[in-house]
């Protein structure tokens, strides 16, 4: 109602048991653009396992949130559906936030079978990002239709370049031989390796 473009993109498999079938239409009735990524079809398909599990909130391309949290009452402990949940998330500003915006727009375009001009959402025009930071953030994403293991490659690079420590916190510790080798080699080189799962 305030003229702000609001888009919601959700994965059908993660939501089809909890959301009504006409949920996208309900949101559109409220002025929210809504798209369902890879809608579930009860037929055997090679694309059924191509899911989008990312959680991205982008605000004007300048601020973004990402992490493990979903939009559900149990994630803020308003209800206790599966016990008391703990999760983590990040708020990013500047160019890293813009990277997450592009990731969202790529999946939006894929889901809607269109190509959108991402630069029309670039928040700083020709001036460039005014945010200054002494930190470094490397947002990355993967596509469900390729065979590259981008996430694994990023983690292997991080582990292989570590000088002092690698701390990993994950509820799902599923590592292959190359990851075990990289962690072992880093530990033998004096890098402090800690994993909480």
Regions found by a protein language model. Give the residues of each.
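Charged, low-complexity intrinsically disordered terminal segments
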Residues: 1-197
